[in-house]
Amino acid sequence: MIEQTTIALLSGGIDSATAACIAMEAGQKVIGLSFDYGQRHLKELQAAADLAKNLNLEDHITIKIDLSSWGGSSLTDTSQAIPTKGIQKNTIPNTYVPGRNTIFVAIGLSLAEARGANRIALGINAMDYSGYPDCRPDYLKAYQELANLSSRVGREGKGIKLWAPLLDWEKTKIFEEALRLKIPIEKTWSCYQGESKPCGRCDSCRIRDKALKEIGREDLCSQNI
């Protein structure tokens, strides 16, 4: 059996860590790919490095891209406040970073083709995407078509698969799977704020804490990290 390789976009959060571990459990070699894009929550990069070491990934690469130079998001522009009043339906919050996932996946495709990887693992999740346009099934489908058209391996019929195993999972299921896979959840980072401790108020903290409470793991909620 030929050993296959997955490029896992590793943010330092629970979703990307779980996707990477599912790939490893399936027998794939996993290379982690993280990005320093000028985000205020730089602590996620340390979480990604810690996870890569803890999970014994084949390799872990961090790319620097300064998306903060033109702003457009409260994650890259500290003059904008992070929303803390809960998720607003039917709106895209200012934590959306213009083009972020599109850029990340493009770099992932380049790395995958160069390293001979057969797929890219994405931790995107449509159930709690907070309105982000680049975490939806139609986005993934369209990007897969582009990936097939824009790469040599795609033209040769051996395209790199954009694989999002958690796309339609509830957050509770993701945490249950993370526990089964023995992922050190306490080492993951979800908070949007650039503070030493999770704020417990941003959308990401709220989604995380709600799911953990529902599965009876309040010990892993933001106030306990």
Swiss-Prot record:
Reactions listed under catalytic activity: 7-carboxy-7-deazaguanine + NH4(+) + ATP = 7-cyano-7-deazaguanine + ADP + phosphate + H2O + H(+)
EC id: 6.3.4.20
The protein's name in its UniProt record: 7-cyano-7-deazaguanine synthase
CDD domains, A to Z: QueC-like
Record has Ligase as a keyword: yes
Protein's job: Catalyzes the ATP-dependent conversion of 7-carboxy-7-deazaguanine (CDG) to 7-cyano-7-deazaguanine (preQ(0)).
Annotated metabolic or biological route of this protein: Purine metabolism; 7-cyano-7-deazaguanine biosynthesis
A Pfam family assignment: QueC
Any GO MF annotation of the entry: ATP binding
Top-tier EC class: ligase
Residues the entry annotates as binding Zn(2+): C191, C199, C202, C205
